[in-house]
C-alpha cells in the first residue's frame, strides 16, 4: 500500500476499500471511524468504570478510530461529569488538529479525523512523541511487568508526566486504559535495533551555520 499525503497508509487503504465497495454487488463497509456502533460498544465499560471507583479524577485514553474515548467519555460524563477525560495521541496524527507527518508505529493516531470523535467529551489532550511512546512501553515492561502495545505505552507516559506536573496538592486518582498487547510489536517497539534506527531517523537535522 502506498503512503498517503500525511505519511501514513490509512487514506490510501480507505480509497482501496471504497473502490472495491463500488465494484462489488451487495457489499458492506464496516467503517469503524464513522459507525456509531463503534463507540456505543464502550458504554458498558464506562458503566463498569463508574461502579468500580468511588473516587476518580482522570481517565487517560489513546485515540485512533476514537471508539473507546467517545464511548467511555459519554458514558462516564453522563454519570460523573467531574471526571476529566484525557485524550492521548502520537505526533504525526491529525486527530486533534495537528499537521500530519510520517508515523512509524501503528495502533495509535490516524491520518484523518474520525467523524465519531465529534461525540466525545474530552477535557485535555496530550501528544506523545514516537520515541517517548517506545520508552513508555519499555518502562511498563521493566517497572510494572506489563507487556503492552503502542497505545498503552503512550497512555502510560502521558499519565506519568501529567501526574508529575499536576497542580493537585494530593496525588489524583487516575485510570489508564491499556487496549493493546505487546506481542504485535516484537519486531518494532521491542526490537532494540529497530528502535535505535528509528531514533536516528527522527533526530532533528543539524542546523546550518
Regions found by a protein language model. Give the residues of each.
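Structural signature of the thiamine diphosphate
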Residues: 11-32, 148, 154-173
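Buried hydrophobic positions in well-ordered alpha/beta secondary-structure cores of metabolic enzymes
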Residues: 30, 49, 59-60, 66, ...
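Active-site-adjacent helical/loop segments in soluble small-molecule enzymes
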Residues: 120-169
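Short, acidic/small-residue loops that bind anionic groups at enzyme active sites
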Residues: 79-92
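Surface-exposed amphipathic alpha-helices with a cationic face
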Residues: 73-80, 163
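Phosphate-binding loop/pocket of nucleotide- and phosphate-handling active sites
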Residues: 111, 160-209
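Short glycine/serine/threonine-rich phosphate/pyrophosphate-binding segments
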Residues: 39, 63-73, 151-159
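Small/polar-residue-rich loop-to-helix segments that shape phosphate-bearing ligand pockets
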Residues: 1-58, 90-136, 141
